[in-house]
Amino acid sequence: MEQRVAITGIGAVSPLGNTALATWAAMCAGTCGIGPITHFDTDAFAVKVAAEVKGFDGNEYFGKRDAKHLDPCVQFAMAASDEAMHDAGFDVEGAIDRERLGVYVGSGVGGMTTLVDNVHTIADRGPRRVSPYMIAMMIPNMASGNIAIRHKAKGPTLPVVTACATSAHAVGEAFRAIKHGYADAILAGGAEAAIIPDAVAGFTSCRALTTNPDPATACRPFDADRDGFVMGEGACVLVLESMEHAQARGAHIYAEVVGYGNTDDAYHITSPDPEAAGIARAISLAVTEGDVKPSEGLYINAHGTSTKLNDSSETAGIKRALGEDAVRAAHVSSTKSMTGHMIGATGAIEVMACAMALEQGVVPPTINYHTPDPACDLDYTPNRAVRADLTWALSTNLGFGGHNAAIALRRYTRS
């Protein structure tokens, strides 16, 4: 028997705040989380701005001894998982069978800070000075591994790595595992901490990042003057739980996950297919599985990276999948205009935005939107949040390698 799947816990560390509620409140207020890069000296760099996490001290949160052995990416993930577990009520002994609790938390690049630091150590001091913790701190599965250890989660584990679609796929695969009975609940999401010289230089070299130095206008998804994305960092972890299990224990339910689409463009390593066939098919798969009725109060949290190619291609894909009439009635926005592009964490934090939007009837805006682009002709909720009677939500994400993910959600109404 297939299970329905609920979202019962949310945790976030983001450029907008170090909790899920702070992040959501900032989204609704149209707050920009982008500012001058402080993690390193940008004098030699064309890129000057990023969406950094602010006020998070790993030494204070974990203690200096433990923090020293955790890459910042993993620190963000573990903090978000703590909040999600507490929010779901799973931090209480006996609340869930730990052999039925899984962890699907990924990262686009993993512990890149650790890798680069140790490369410099080899160059400066020789190979014998490399940390014995380097490998365990660097590999992308360690967010999932450390979360499982921390919360004694002994169920299925699946660290996902699909670039910018990572945590969307993690949420989708967790949904599938619970739907088909492999777990009662799964911590699903992603984390990233790659605002470092090497990553910024690499993304700049492939012409993905904006060189606009003004934080207030640097990230402007769907605007005609957009010219690249802004690097972000942080983590978001959701507790997905079978509806039966959640209702039996009286859990708070934010929304129901009802569909998932996973496709690949098979087109190019970094550029999206201009025909948008892959993302359109992912949306269609999610909508079909969830029996979504797009004309009945739909919010779409678009990938909306603020790059020329993505935003026009994604717009075409949304229209191709849902049809012109349904899309014209839908509310669309890109919360990346506020969070920046959190890479491996972006899918989960955008599913969070969908769940909160459904529960509270508020559509977060696309800020910095001023000049319409004829190729991007939907209602992108410009600059201010709006109230709306929502029944359905879609979160779409695309990653380097042609990876596409779409997650469909439904507003939860206790029957």
Where are these regions (language model features)?
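Active-site-proximal alpha-helical scaffold in enzymes
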Residues: A77-F90, P140-S144, A148-E192, V230-A251, ...
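Glycine-/small-residue-rich "gating" segment that lines the acyl/pantetheine channel
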Residues: D124-S131, H169-G172, R176, E192-A248, ...
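Phosphate/pyrophosphate-binding loops at sites that engage ATP/ADP/AMP, CoA/4′-phosphopantetheine
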Residues: A84-D97, A246-I253, I283-Y299, A321-A326
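Acyl-CoA/ACP chain-elongation machinery
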Residues: Y182-D227, Y260-P274, G304-D311, R328-D379
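Conserved beta-ketoacyl condensing-enzyme motif
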Residues: I7, A20-T23, C28-A163, A191-V200, ...
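A glycine- and small-aliphatic-rich helix-loop capping segment at beta-alpha/alpha-beta transitions
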Residues: L21-A26, M112-P127, A177-H180, V200-P213, ...
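ACP-dependent fatty acid/polyketide chain-elongation machinery
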Residues: M1-D66, E244-E256, M352-T366, R410-S415
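Condensing-enzyme catalytic core mediating Claisen C-C bond formation in acyl metabolism
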Residues: R4-T8, T31-G35, D214-G290, L298-Y299, ...
